[in-house]
Amino acid sequence: MKLVEVLQHTIWVDAIRSAEPIVLDCGANRGDFARWAVDHLGATVYAFEADPILAATLPTVPRLHPYNVAIAGEDGTMQLTRAKNRCTSACFNPQLEDTETFTVASRSLESIRQEHGLAFIDLIKLDIEGAEIEVLENISASFLAHVGQISCEFHDFLDATQRPIIRKLLQRLQQSGFVVMPISFWRYGDVLLINRRFQSVRLWDRVAIATYKYRTGIQRILSRSLSRVTRRG
């Protein structure tokens, strides 16, 4: 079992097909995760970034298809707000000071799969600044049947009231055949979801995942502590 952390997203690498895997990078930012998937998985990557400034920086390399769209529960348009002094993806906070707004096309994962004729999606990476709840609430069981794994960053560290909703979503995903593996301590900032239809999760896999979780969690805590000490210095 090979678990790797890429930009604080845990991926079960050897559960991904070795031949022509498909990855959806939702909340692609500047494309670092998408580029990793191309280089290390040999994947064809569909990279979606809502912010046009960030979308313009997505790499132009073979097998990487960039799109300036927001991932949402349904197709349409969205008006988003971002802080002028920083670049982030997706669900921009309208209560921030010194902001600017823009309108962007929004797409559902189901319509994207249909448009591109994707029979199977090996990996969906979701990091869309809070919009992941709406997206997962609107995903059908028939869509999930075509997905191998999901690596999701929920944003309950910004809004703790999301946690009951997140727990309910994860229960539904379990009922749809996914093994739910929260990697983060105390929060849902890194959740790996594995579809049992395509990858069995045995007892020793669960032990390996638990070991990885605590090792990674300790490393993250130490890294944040060191960063705070460095800033104070």
Question: Model regions: which residues?
Answer:
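Phosphate/nucleotide-binding beta-alpha loop and adjacent structural elements of enzyme active sites
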Residues: 1-233
